[in-house]
Amino acid sequence: MSKKKKLCDSRKGDMAEYYAVTWLWDNGYEVFKNCGCTGIADLIALKDGQTTLIDVKTAQPQLHKKTGNNFTKCCSRTKEQIEAGVQLLQFNAVDRSLYFTKHRDKKYD
């Protein structure tokens, strides 16, 4: 039995974005990728006349020290992303699931 090769962080990010594209397609979105490696959003998604700017983030598995429960940790949006209405789409690399982050407020994360 061969060992799986460990992926570098940039390759994990590439995988997350491609899983995000297919997940969004499955959920009725038309998807357009950011052609550069920088910018406030990775994807632009259209559905039912609504445009959504999306930044895909790979969630990091964590173990809660007090409870022992597993949870995923992700980062916050930047001020520029908040002002532009960018939504974070989290990718769980363990089970390859995706979900939109429920942002606390439009002005603050």
Pin down the residues of each PLM region:
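Structural signal for conserved beta-strand scaffold positions within catalytic alpha/beta enzyme cores
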Residues: 33, 55, 90-92
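Ligand-binding grooves and catalytic loops that recognize ribose/phosphate and carbohydrate rings
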Residues: 71-85
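Domain-level recognition of nuclease-like catalytic cores that cleave nucleotide substrates
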Residues: 82-109
